[in-house]
Amino acid sequence: MKAVILLSGGLDSSTILYQAKADGCECYSISFDYQQRHRRELHSAFLVAQTAGIVQHQVVNFDLRLWGGSALTDDKIDLPQERSVDAMSQNIPVTYVPARNTIFLSFALAYAEAIAAERVYIGVNALDYSGYPDCRPDYIEAMQEVFRLGTKQGREGQPINIVAPLINLKKTAIIQLGNQLGVPWNLTWSCYNGGDVACGVCDSCRLRLAAFAELGLEDPLPYLKGV
């Protein structure tokens, strides 16, 4: 069966790409250049897609700096640094991009329907939905209803299904799953800062580094500063 995979090039999305392959899917990945601070991730997405040997990798371009509203799309908003995991989960962080997953899933839905795909894979997980409203199980359920009601395939009784295999997993479990699937961690990118070397102090870097450390594993990526 055909599947569209939302691929940022990060740890989570790379894992779901390899999961989709393990599920026997014919994989088509889609990434987004929305002029994010961390556009470096797009290079990783390309490398991961190429290494996985997928059918097609697409990059959609649009500019969310037009209205900002996030530290990832507005340079005037500072990125949080050196926060604890507990501090990260207290409220919705400034790295939340307004309606981003709704935008991404809408593009993925259009792509999936155009190629008659049966599935759309997204890498939302338990750690994400503690802080991000568009990563929660009830959000995914609501978007599944949109997929059913708003497409020709859905109206004909063959809805495109959203698959979120990481929805109940934390970062450590995702890394363990990725190891089983053979995800090339050295090609992935999680850092929110721009640049060629991961900072090691933004929320995303710290979550990733802490998970590898908890498992007693070494993250193959170099960092400017470790945990």
Curated annotation (Swiss-Prot):
Single GO BP term: queuosine biosynthetic process
Enzyme class: ligase
Source species, domain of life: Bacteria
Catalyzed chemical reaction(s): 7-carboxy-7-deazaguanine + NH4(+) + ATP = 7-cyano-7-deazaguanine + ADP + phosphate + H2O + H(+)
UniProt KW keywords: ATP-binding, Ligase, Metal-binding, Nucleotide-binding, Queuosine biosynthesis, Zinc
Enzyme Commission number(s) of this protein: 6.3.4.20
Pathway(s) per entry: Purine metabolism; 7-cyano-7-deazaguanine biosynthesis
Cofactor(s) annotated in UniProt: Zn(2+)
Pfam family, one: QueC
Positions bound to ATP: L7, S8, G9, G10, L11, D12, S13, S14, T15, I16, L17
Gene Ontology molecular functions: ATP binding; ligase activity, forming carbon-nitrogen bonds; zinc ion binding
This protein's record includes keyword Lyase: no
Annotated Zn(2+) binding sites: C191, C199, C202, C205
Cofactor binding note: Binds 1 zinc ion per subunit.
InterPro entries: QueC (IPR018317), Rossmann-like_a/b/a_fold (IPR014729)
Family: Belongs to the QueC family.
HAMAP family: QueC (MF_01633)
Function: Catalyzes the ATP-dependent conversion of 7-carboxy-7-deazaguanine (CDG) to 7-cyano-7-deazaguanine (preQ(0)).
Name used for this protein in its record: 7-cyano-7-deazaguanine synthase
Species of origin: Trichormus variabilis (strain ATCC 29413 / PCC 7937)
Gene for this chain: queC
